[in-house]
Amino acid sequence: MSAVTRCEDGLVLRLYIQPKASRDSIVGLHGDEVKVAITAPPVDGQANSHLIKFLGKQFRVAKSQIVIEKGELGRHKQVKIIHPQQIPPEITALTE
């Protein structure tokens, strides 16, 4: 499975999360996953909620349209984004 997969109602992303980074960013490919750096620490779900907020801004969707399908407690996650309004250039490059 590739890092970015299109489905009938949006995108499915396979992510590798780097918590406690200096800034929030989509770094690029990390093996067969997209590496995302976020500033939040991996404590009490802070990193997950911060990741959802960051992805919501990047894809211009409500937080309720982002679902962590797999990897709630780990760095390797599978996230579904329902009906993205915008796709960041880093992700567009991976879908082509």
From Swiss-Prot:
InterPro entries: DUF167 (IPR003746), YggU-like_sf (IPR036591). Gene3D superfamilies: YggU-like. GO terms for cellular component: cytoplasm. Pfam families: DUF167 (PF02594). HAMAP family: UPF0235. Belongs to the UPF0235 family. This is UPF0235 protein YggU. It comes from Salmonella heidelberg (strain SL476). The lineage of its organism: Bacteria, Pseudomonadati, Pseudomonadota, Gammaproteobacteria, Enterobacterales.
